[in-house]
């Protein structure tokens, strides 16, 4: 292990949600180890805390089985370089944050070199490819899970796992202030707003921008006073979305915001969004939503054959039943989106809000502190 008194933690975060988790964990670990060094692949929030990124985390932000194949040589080269660098560095612990197809192989190699490894965010082994749990058991000293039902799955297979809760549930208040959010964004305090979130990755916008924009046009016809607001994660995604608007809805007025997705969701009356971590955020800000998603037909056919779940979005998975509508693949059409969004705009939301509140409280556990404590105990165990 690292021979000096300074603790060294290596981390790899694969996308924005991982960057948030990584930043929270770094802050919590610094409480115990103020002089610790953090190195690997991180996003902007991690970098702002002094994290040393060896590669841009955009390298890992690839969606879909088919899409990954075209980038595979580069991904393998990045992983090989990381293995070499970290084997030489010998950190006190390696923490792979999500990105399981990249990180678990990395963890396997590092653990074989005597480096303690943690995987933060359980892969969806309970949903598809369940045999991955045997590789996870070999690759990691411990899994940190965000969702309460995951620990039981790991316990059943005798894989060390700690349920830590979710940082988003800690960060987002139990009650979100719609008027304050609108004031922050300069939105009309009296209008009805639909937030449209087509995803944070280029591949997601490629698949979802067109049906989302076309649905917005139809919704405007049905609700002439309805307004739209869309957060885009960066200038590149904004340009991609603006091209979809120009192509499919040149006359549609949508208020575009760079970043601030949580504020946008809090400002909205309802949300149309891609499946992913954003659905959890929408649940935590207590807004009715419609989840839609599609990938390339080949990716979908391969994935569908491996799936062992009946729900895709986190709110439905946490509830164990469908509490919000999901429009997946062939169902992700403008007309179906319009009908589902209309039901959310016009419906009685009291039972849904009660479900959201219960789930929020289950996940609110001071996740970063719990995760840090689990890592500290692992590192301090000889």
Swiss-Prot record:
Keyword Lipid biosynthesis: yes
GO molecular-function terms, A-Z: lipid-A-disaccharide synthase activity; phospholipid binding
Entry-linked CDD domains: Glycosyltransferase_GTB-type
EC number(s) recorded for this UniProt protein: 2.4.1.182
Keywords (A to Z) from UniProt: Glycosyltransferase, Lipid A biosynthesis, Lipid biosynthesis, Lipid metabolism, Transferase
Transmembrane segments: none
InterPro entries per record: Glyco_trans_19
UniProt enzyme class: transferase
UniProt keyword Glycosyltransferase present: yes
One Gene Ontology term from the biological process aspect of the record: lipid A biosynthetic process
Family recorded in the similarity comment: Belongs to the LpxB family.
Official protein name in the record: Lipid-A-disaccharide synthase
Phylogenetic lineage: Bacteria, Pseudomonadati, Pseudomonadota, Gammaproteobacteria, Alteromonadales
Gene name in the database record: lpxB
């Amino acid at each position: 292990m690292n021979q000096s008194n300074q603790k060294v933690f290596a981390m790899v975060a694969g996308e924005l949600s991982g960057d948030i988790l990584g930043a929270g964990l770094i802050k919590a670990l610094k409480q115990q180890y103020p002089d610790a060094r953090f190195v690997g692949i991180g996003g902007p929030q991690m970098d702002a805390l002094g994290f040393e990124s060896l590669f841009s985390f955009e390298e890992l932000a690839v969606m879909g089985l088919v899409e990954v194949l075209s980038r595979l040589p580069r991904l393998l080269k990045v992983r090989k370089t990381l293995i070499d660098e970290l084997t030489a560095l010998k950190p006190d612990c390696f923490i792979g944050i999500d990105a399981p197809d990249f990180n678990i192989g990395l963890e396997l190699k590092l653990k074989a070199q005597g480096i303690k490894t943690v995987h933060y965010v359980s892969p969806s082994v309970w949903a598809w490819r369940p045999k991955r749990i045997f590789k996870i058991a070999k690759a990691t000293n411990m899994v940190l899970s965000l969702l309460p039902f995951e620990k039981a799955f790991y316990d059943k297979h005798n894989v060390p796992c700690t349920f830590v809760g979710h940082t988003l549930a800690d960060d987002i208040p139990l009650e979100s202030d719609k008027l304050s959010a609108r004031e922050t964004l300069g939105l009309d305090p009296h209008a009805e707003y639909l937030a449209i979130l087509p995803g944070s990755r280029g591949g997601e916008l490629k698949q979802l921008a067109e049906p989302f924009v076309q649905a917005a046009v139809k919704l405007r016809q049905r609700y002439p006073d309805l307004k739209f607001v869309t957060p885009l994660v960066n200038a590149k995604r904004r340009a991609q979305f603006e091209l979809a608007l120009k192509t499919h809805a040149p006359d549609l007025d949508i208020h575009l915001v760079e970043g601030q997705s949580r504020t946008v969701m809090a400002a909205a009356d309802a949300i149309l969004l891609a499946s992913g971590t954003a659905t959890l955020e929408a649940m935590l800000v207590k807004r009715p939503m419609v989840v839609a998603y599609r990938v390339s037909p080949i990716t979908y056919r391969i994935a569908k054959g491996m799936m062992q779940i009946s729900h895709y979005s986190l709110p439905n998975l946490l509830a164990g039943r469908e509490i919000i509508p999901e429009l997946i693949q062939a169902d992700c059409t403008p007309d179906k989106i319009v009908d589902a969004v209309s039901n959310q705009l016009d419906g009685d939301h009291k039972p849904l809000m009660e479900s959201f509140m219960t789930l929020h409280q289950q996940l609110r556990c001071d996740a970063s502190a719990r995760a840090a404590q689990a890592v500290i105990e692992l590192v301090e165990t000889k």
